[in-house]
Every structure is written in C-alpha cells, then in structure tokens.
Amino acid sequence: MAVKIKLQRMGKIRNAEYRVIVADARTRRSGKAIENIGIYQPKQEPSLIQIDSERAQYWLGVGAQPTEPVLALLKVTGDWQKFKGLPGAEGTLKVAEEKPSKLDLFNAALAEANNGPTIEAITEKKRKAKEEAEAKAAAEKAAEEAAAAEAAKAEEEAAKAEEADSAEESAE
C-alpha cells in the first residue's frame, strides 16, 4: 500500500488550517487518515508549524512519500534534513513571540489599580450634587461680591460726605 504524508484542510473559508496526516495515496484530500502527525496554520504570523518529528521520521523511514507542500514544511522544521542526513537539521522555523500570560496582565492591572484612580467615578447623583454645589457656591460668591460692592459704595459716599463736612468747617 502506497502511503503519503499530506495536508488535510480544516478551518473556515479564507482561514485555512491544515493537519499533516499520513494516509493511503488513493484517498481524497479530506479522506480518512492513518495518523495525524502535525498541524500547519499559514494565516498566523509567523506561520504555525507543529510536526511530531519522531512520527515523521518513522513514516519517512518506512517509505511514506511526502507531497510537495509537506516536503517544504519538513525542510522548514528540519525533519527532512535529519531523515536524509544533510546538514541544517535544526531547520529555519520562525517562532512567534510569547504572549504575556493572563496572570501577568491581571497582576499589572491590579498594581495600577492599587495606585488609586486618577479621577473619581461619576454617577448621575454625584454629578447633579456637584453641579448644585457649584451653582450654590457661585451664587454665594456673587452675593458676597455684591455686598462688597455696596459696602465700598457706602464707604465712598461716607468719605465724600466727610470731605464735604470738613470743607464746610474750614470755610467757616
């Protein structure tokens, strides 16, 4: 029985994901597999390639023929060079940067929250109370200014009257 290592398409439309499978050469692309030995997700940046090296070496050793796309993947992971005994068995696989764990993100947010909020949370009641307090303060300030203006006016009139009295006394 001729055995091939090929890609089996999975995933949604325009979001292709593949399984690297070992199957009879006569089966269709999405047919029954003998063994699933890896995954390939070309839409990620960089592409995700995970192939079980031990199982790939076994199947290549017993005569399974890789298809052209799988051969390219095996060369990237270094499994083909290892099988053929060529230099460069480490491959040229690019690894994505590790995402920060959710626990680290949570701890960072918690530390930031412990520093205290930069502004107060404003609810409707607090907003109305604040507006009323501001309006009351503005009214009081206006009343104080008006009272101060009246007092200044009264003092000015008193000073004028005093000047007039002193001028009359000096004239006599």
UniProtKB/Swiss-Prot annotation:
One of its GO terms (molecular function) is structural constituent of ribosome. Residues 129-144, 152-163 have a biased composition (Basic and acidic residues). GO terms for cellular component: cytoplasm; small ribosomal subunit. Keywords: Ribonucleoprotein, Ribosomal protein. GO terms for biological process: translation. Pfam families: Ribosomal_S16. The keyword Heme does not apply. Residues 125-172 are annotated as: Disordered. PANTHER family: 30S RIBOSOMAL PROTEIN S16 (PTHR12919), SMALL RIBOSOMAL SUBUNIT PROTEIN BS16M (PTHR12919:SF20). Belongs to the bacterial ribosomal protein bS16 family. This is Small ribosomal subunit protein bS16. It comes from Corynebacterium aurimucosum (strain ATCC 700975 / DSM 44827 / CIP 107346 / CN-1).
